[in-house]
Amino acid sequence: MKPIKALSVASEIFPLIKTGGLADVTGALPGALKPHGITLRTLVPGYPTVIAGIEAALPVHVFPALFGGPARLLAARKGDVELFVLDAPHLYKRPGNPYASPDGRDWPDNAQRFAALARAAAEIGQGLVPAFVPDIVHAHDWQAGLTAAYLRYSDKPAPATVFTVHNLAFQGQFPRELLGTLGLPPSSFGVDGVEYYGAIGYMKAGLQLSDRITTVSPAYALEIQAPEAGMGLDGLLRQRSHHLTGILNGIDEKVWNPATDKRIAATYDVKTLPARGANKAALRERFGLASETDRLLIGVISRLSWQKGLDLLLETLPLLLSEGIQLALLGAGDAALEAAFRQVAQSHPGQIGVVVGYDEDLAHLIQAGADALLVPSRFEPCGLTQLCALRYGAVPVVARVGGLSDTVVDANEMAIAAGVATGVQFSPVTRDMLAAALIKTHGLYSDRTTWQALQQNGMRSDVSWRNPAQHYAQLYRNLLAARSPHLAM
């Protein structure tokens, strides 16, 4: 098996910078691919938290002028993960999150900020760092979408390219007048290049110009080829369907392991499920919920947005309250949803608890202490919280979309009888169907034998990176074989 060098290009990587599941994936993939003979090094922007968190940083290149200022390319690491960091203070040394200011507005120069990331990635791909010349450049989401464009519209030899869609809803569209500023030739602005409805489309560029496309579940790979979920790119995705693959994400079993988790009140495994009770008690105390042990406690860990279906949860709260179900919600996002959930928590203390924001420790406690985890997304490319829920014995209640449908086995009569059910699915994604799913979940919870079977089935599921890594490794080798057969050996 011939060793492969690959460069991952992403705007986030756990544990240095995280706003969502993208960071978890890019953080776990290098370690997952290592047993397959693949050295995956990740290029990320030099945000303040990244610069502060990296180890053994060594400058390997200086860009005298990169979209408005000088920049350094650092070789570094974080634990076992090898990194390149683009240290460009004029682009990345800012408050707020990677994409927006503290008041929630997108940075006005995001086009340049993420073009710089892609430009650096392309140059690394073409041999900028002699000690690490990748066979493959693997870009993630719109922020890295121009990587393939810089490689395509260059006279230098280019490595193979892979582009992964984590969420098609965020596409990175910018005015065509920036084409020259971004260093792209006029010939790139066409339907077979970066042009997208008269603008420069970063996501579109990645989809159009990369050798292979992946997305983060088989179901989502099919859904985005239809107008309902294709976000205007379904035609292109149908055209490139023979180069499109859906590969499920996994979770890091070292980080998400209830038997060793130091962030929870009591550790446990599939054979010691009663020990979960201490976590339920701790979770109730943290959220100010009443301590009746027989009440169903549903957890939610989510961005508060229309996509995530949290408005539907608000509409079904009267049912939840009448059923005596408790709710512990951790999330942030839409200001109106944040205010609405705060209000219902104030109106129903003891039954509804809400923490606005994100807290990794609290997320672990919710997974370990909630009886069920609700994910009512209108669309969900893969989803990671339901994978963690399976691992922790929190029965997932999910919309039948994308990766949720690929990873949760609905507790219908046949699945229960066969001993394979792991959760509850509902479809279509409406208030009434969510309400029906909550009633069904409450009924299953009242049958403790069935409920424990759902928990145990979920905890025995393989939600690790083993299978996904094998699929990515095969994709890499097949791609290299198509370009240079001797590299596939």
UniProtKB/Swiss-Prot annotation:
GO term, biological process aspect, one: glycogen biosynthetic process
GO cellular component terms, semicolon-separated: cytosol
Residues the record lists as binding ADP-alpha-D-glucose: K18
Catalytic activity: [(1->4)-alpha-D-glucosyl](n) + ADP-alpha-D-glucose = [(1->4)-alpha-D-glucosyl](n+1) + ADP + H(+)
Functional pathway: Glycan biosynthesis; glycogen biosynthesis
GO MF terms held by the record: alpha-1,4-glucan glucosyltransferase (ADP-glucose donor) activity; alpha-1,4-glucan glucosyltransferase (UDP-glucose donor) activity
Keywords, alphabetical: Glycogen biosynthesis, Glycosyltransferase, Transferase
Origin: domain of life: Bacteria
This enzyme's EC code(s): 2.4.1.21
Annotated family: Belongs to the glycosyltransferase 1 family. Bacterial/plant glycogen synthase subfamily.
UniProt cross-references to NCBIfam families, sorted A to Z: glgA, PRK00654.1-2, PRK14099.1
Role, per record: Synthesizes alpha-1,4-glucan chains using ADP-glucose.
Protein name: Glycogen synthase
Gene: glgA
